[in-house]
Amino acid sequence: MPTEADTCRTLVLPKLYAAGWTDEQIAEQCTFTAGRIVVQGTKATRRKGKRADYLLRYTRDKVLAVIEAKVEYKKPADGLQQAIDYAQILGLKFAYSTNGHGIIEFDLITGKETELDGFPTPAALWSRLRAGENLKDDAQAERILTPLNLTTGKIPMNSPRAWTGGANAKKT
């Protein structure tokens, strides 16, 4: 019986590659929250954190979308609510659920759910994000793509976005 990992490896990744995503842009099995601490008596344990099957990055520091993959025999939409929840936590605008055959997209900018034949290209997704976030000025869009300064550990002061280790934070 196939597993979710089989679906990811044999069905989802080839579709991402076909859409032009590269290994550098595809982050697999990303834990983006620490697990909840549960106290029982005098002992405290940490549960597992939330883990996205895939995060799609436009650049190293700019995550555009989350994908929740389900095993092949489930419906493509079975993981959509989970993907939407993850996208909201991460401040992302695009959530996808797939069983490797069908793909369901939820656009958090428009609130629309769409069934797709394939994943959008990185450029198409970035273009849609720019349009949805009203980033018409190329200079402003470039500032959003400016990476964290790893030497100083600071974000450039003229950058309009905040950075978190797992993905993009919501604008403040």
Report each predicted region and the residues it spans.
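ATP-dependent helicase/translocase motor core
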Residues: M1-V66, K70-T172
